[in-house]
Regions:
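Active-site His/Glu-centered metal-binding helix of metallohydrolases
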Residues: 50-58, 315
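Non-catalytic beta-strand/loop surface segments
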Residues: 1-42, 66-149, 183-238, 262-306, ...
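Helix N-cap motif at beta-to-alpha junctions
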Residues: 147-150, 245-250
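Solvent-exposed, non-transmembrane alpha-helical starts
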Residues: 43-45, 152-154, 171, 306-309
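Catalytic Zn2+-binding segment of zinc metalloproteases
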Residues: 56-66
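A common structural junction motif
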Residues: 160-168, 260-267
């Protein structure tokens, strides 16, 4: 891109995977991201929260990584997958309890063949920092910060990780996700965001489901849906890689082709949604919580790529930028309010401007 201060080099592998490289020789490290263009918007309606808890499972290894005896482990994991499907379909609470007890027993048996935290140990041995991931409405992103001389080993490990993840230690990780969900229920900003999206996009997944999902769905997961989700969206033509730091772009391109070039592309299902009702009247929602009262205003606009969506971040920045926005100068620095800010939420299908 002309006049790009980051001098980002862009390349697309034959299988559709996009690469973004930016060289910076200041320190001998490379910051990495692997992004998948899928998020909670794409969760099946009956298993909301799936994109997020699958992100957690991407740290559990594959049939070659994280196992002590894959054949024995797989036989048990296959049973667990079927039991989760029975558990989800069952309506009798006593039967569900019995099924979950069997899931728990088999999970303990399968754990004997799992090498726990092997991925984390391998990236730690490389000298990686900031190993993490996050899921949002339309993206899931996996992060690392590695020494420059470990780039090929990182490529090798990540290609294995994305080849075919295994849902080992699943129900214990789901308990961690459910605890994250429970904590979020006490956070007023999450409740306000949810209420606002319900008003702005009442029949779109932006307004009908959240990234953390519904509690009842987290209690009734489907491993079959998870594998189907992976097969559908975790494909190279729906993924991008970012490298920034001390590396040779030509060498990185060769490594990307070597380790990710063999991944087979697939057609990505088009996302369809109903037109949202016109917002012709002011609609008020009162949300009750533990924090001091505040007022939030939001307006809906068209989605990413439209002129309106491109203007929203500029408008929000004019209002609030931590230093010289209109809110900064007139409200915060003049001590008229305890807190005030503005931001734009720009999603693919709809955007919004939020004033707080």
């Amino acid at each position: 891109v002309p006049h790009d201060p980051m001098q980002v080099l862009q390349h697309t592998l034959p299988n559709g995977m996009r690469l973004f490289f930016s060289v910076n020789k200041e320190v001998p490290r490379v910051y990495t991201e692997i992004a998948v263009r899928v998020g909670s918007k794409h969760d099946p309606a009956e298993t909301t929260g799936l994109a997020h808890y699958f992100e957690h499972m991407m740290f559990k290894g594959t049939d070659r990584l994280g196992t002590l005896d894959w054949n024995k482990e797989k036989a048990i994991l296959d049973q667990i997958e079927q039991l989760f499907e029975q558990h989800r379909a069952e309506t009798d609470l006593a039967v569900k309890k019995t099924l979950y007890a069997e899931i728990d027993r088999l999970s303990s048996e399968a754990a004997r063949f799992a090498a726990a935290n092997e991925y984390d140990k391998l990236v730690s041995a490389m000298g990686a920092k900031g190993t993490n991931a996050y899921t949002w409405v339309e993206q899931t992103v996996y992060l690392n910060d590695i020494p420059a001389n470990e780039l090929e080993r990182w490529f090798q490990l990540e290609s294995e990780r994305f080849r075919r993840p295994v849902l080992r230690l699943f129900h214990t990780e789901l308990e961690t996700v459910f605890e994250e969900y429970n904590i979020s229920q006490d956070r007023d900003f999450r409740k306000v965001m949810k209420a606002g999206q319900e008003v702005l996009t009442p029949t779109h997944p932006y307004g009908t489901q959240t990234t953390l999902g519904r509690g009842e769905d987290l209690k009734n997961p489907s491993q079959t849906n998870i594998y189907r989700f992976f097969d559908t969206y975790y494909v190279p033509n729906n993924m991008g890689m970012v490298l920034c730091g001390d590396f040779d772009p030509q060498e990185a391109l060769k490594l990307a082709q070597q380790y990710f070039g063999g991944f087979a592309p697939k057609p990505i299902p088009a996302f369809h949604f109903d037109p949202q009702p016109q917002l012709t009247l002011r609609e008020r929602r009162d949300v009750y919580g533990n924090e001091a009262p505040w007022v939030e205003l939001a307006w809906r606009f068209p989605g990413a790529g439209t002129p309106e969506a491109r203007m929203l971040p500029l408008l929000a920045g004019m209002l609030f930028n931590y230093q010289a926005g209109l809110f900064d100068l007139n409200l915060i620095q003049n001590q008229q309010v305890l807190e005030a800010y503005a931001y734009a939420r720009v999603y693919e299908d709809f955007s919004s401007l939020v004033l707080h």
